[in-house]
């Protein structure tokens, strides 16, 4: 079976996290014997507008990656926008290169409605079976722009729409009257290769991972940690970066927590793996999620989890794996963190890892996706 992924990008040495979720899924399907290629778009700044080589081809672990540069012209250089081609034009030219080298795919699998909309020509002109996986947090807000609402027509052309959580599926049903099925995110096999290392000393380490954006709730997390009045042997490591870093730093200074709360910046998957192994509890303080893949990455290590009811974790996190709290509730989050420091040894790491593997491993989720492909292809004969 020849599958063409349509994505926001694919990881590279320079951009290690771009399209990482889609890359893990593509590799899992390739491991099942499918011929998987990826057609990806790379956002680039204005200086790339007149860059000649806008389409590239590379191979990663047996997967052909066809990428094109899409230039995002800033307001400062808006006079140059007349030289920009539509995103769909870039995808069309990239597909022509793929078509010349590999022929027509059996099925197209687009990730998020933005890229599905800009590759609808694959359905309308080539009549290719078309699957969409939605995991865009924006689609779980109930407050989408008119432009995004127009893009939602792509759902109606799809042979099957997949959502990564029930909350997101409900949102698509309520906002766009779209029926979908739920197939959760998968966790990379690399997270199962090593387990959490229990510390012999008296230190306790919380870890949180994510982009520094408002919806991730790191401001709430710092407030909760400060409210807990933890002794010096309890610390919090935060992995990530972004627009709200200064706000988080100001709160750390305000509460005089610089000795206990560390901002570690962006880390590679291997570095995240190692940090999780040397942590005692994962904390998700998000205001909004579609699933929260970082939670299952932590569970793959055997870590107990504290997570907010933010649209994803409440659908799979069970009481024997951790604690669910209401979002934006500083006291409830703080109380959960204090409880975890005292009772984290009550959680069975082996049981958490097994639950995670049985429900979210590459093998399990890839099998579910292959079943969707077969069902769609049988209807398109």
Place the predicted regions along the sequence by residue.
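Short hydrophobic beta-strand element within catalytic cores of glycosyltransferases
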Residues: 304-307
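Carbohydrate-associated surface elements
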Residues: 167, 186
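Conserved donor-binding/catalytic core segment of Leloir-type glycosyltransferases
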Residues: 4, 199-216, 222-225, 237
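Conserved acidic donor-binding segment of nucleotide-sugar-dependent glycosyltransferases
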Residues: 319, 323-330, 339-345
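Short alpha-helical donor nucleotide-sugar binding micro-motif in glycosyltransferases
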Residues: 266-267, 274-279
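N-terminal subdomain of nucleotide-sugar transferases
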Residues: 1-61, 374, 381
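Aromatic "clamp/platform" in nucleotide-sugar-dependent glycosyltransferases that forms part
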Residues: 287
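Short His-centered aromatic/hydrophobic patch
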Residues: 110-115
């Amino acid at each position: 079976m020849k599958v063409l992924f349509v994505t926001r990008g694919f990881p590279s040495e320079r951009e290690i996290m771009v399209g990482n979720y889609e890359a893990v899924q593509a590799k899992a399907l390739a491991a099942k014997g499918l011929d998987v290629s990826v057609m990806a778009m790379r956002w680039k700044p204005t200086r790339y507008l007149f860059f000649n080589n806008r389409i590239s081809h590379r191979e990663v672990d047996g997967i052909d990656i066809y990428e094109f540069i899409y230039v995002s012209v800033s307001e400062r250089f808006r006079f140059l926008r007349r030289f920009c081609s539509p995103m769909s034009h870039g995808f069309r030219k990239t597909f022509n290169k793929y078509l010349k080298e590999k022929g027509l795919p059996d099925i197209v699998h687009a990730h998020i409605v933005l890229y599905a909309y800009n590759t609808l020509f694959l359905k309308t002109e080539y009549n290719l079976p078309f699957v969409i996986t939605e995991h865009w947090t924006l689609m779980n807000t109930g407050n989408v722009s008119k432009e995004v609402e127009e893009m939602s027509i792509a759902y109606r052309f799809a042979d099957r729409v997949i959502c990564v959580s029930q909350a997101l599926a409900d949102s698509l049903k309520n906002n766009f009257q779209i029926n979908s099925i739920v197939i959760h995110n998968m966790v990379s096999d690399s997270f199962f290769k090593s387990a959490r290392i229990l510390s012999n000393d008296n230190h306790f380490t919380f870890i949180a991972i994510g982009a520094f954006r408002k919806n991730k709730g790191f401001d709430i997390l710092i407030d909760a940690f400060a409210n807990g009045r933890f002794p010096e042997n309890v610390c919090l490591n935060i992995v990530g970066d972004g627009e709200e870093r200064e706000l988080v730093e100001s709160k750390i200074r305000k509460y005089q927590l610089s000795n206990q709360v560390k901002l570690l910046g962006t880390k590679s998957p291997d570095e995240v793996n190692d940090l999780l192994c040397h942590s005692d509890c994962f904390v998700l303080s998000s205001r909004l999620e579609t699933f929260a893949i970082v939670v299952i990455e932590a569970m793959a290590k055997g870590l107990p989890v504290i997570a907010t009811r933010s649209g994803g974790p409440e659908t799979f996190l069970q009481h024997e794996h951790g604690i669910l709290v209401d979002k934006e509730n500083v006291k409830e989050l703080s109380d959960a963190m204090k409880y975890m420091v005292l009772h984290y040894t009550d959680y069975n790491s082996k049981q958490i890892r097994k639950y995670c593997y049985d429900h979210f491993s590459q093998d399990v989720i890839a099998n579910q996706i292959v079943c969707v492909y077969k069902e769609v292809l049988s209807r398109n004969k």
